Amino acid sequence: MNLAAYYPVLLFLLVGTGLGIALVSIGKLLGPNKPDVDKNAPYECGFEAFEDARMKFDVRYYLVAILFIIFDLETAFLFPWGVALRDIGWPGFSAMMIFLLEFLLGFAYIWKKGGLDWE
């Protein structure tokens, strides 16, 4: 196996990492360091923090986040499928239609069970 083809990638990684470390270090060394009470206080939308940061969230926020991830992954699978559709032909098309039908049925189930209602 010829590893010489990977030397430009290794050089790119080393230069990028070295440059990043150098710039952060220069900023730490030359930048002003004057901490005070206001700079060290927790920031909450321009207001003083009025509650503990560890408060309970409604479980529906987590449900919406999980549903977003699921349907976002579905669209992530759609893009390469669309690019390769000419090469994969009818078997690939039918497999993706079955995949989309499963997600559509899942979406209908979530909707019917009230997973998207905020009442």
From Swiss-Prot:
GO terms for cellular component: NADH dehydrogenase complex; plasma membrane. One of its GO terms (molecular function) is quinone binding. It is found in: Cell inner membrane. It catalyses: a quinone + NADH + 5 H(+)(in) = a quinol + NAD(+) + 4 H(+)(out). Belongs to the complex I subunit 3 family. NDH-1 shuttles electrons from NADH, via FMN and iron-sulfur (Fe-S) centers, to quinones in the respiratory chain. The immediate electron acceptor for the enzyme in this species is believed to be ubiquinone. Couples the redox reaction to proton translocation (for every two electrons transferred, four hydrogen ions are translocated across the cytoplasmic membrane), and thus conserves the redox energy in a proton gradient. This is NADH-quinone oxidoreductase subunit A.
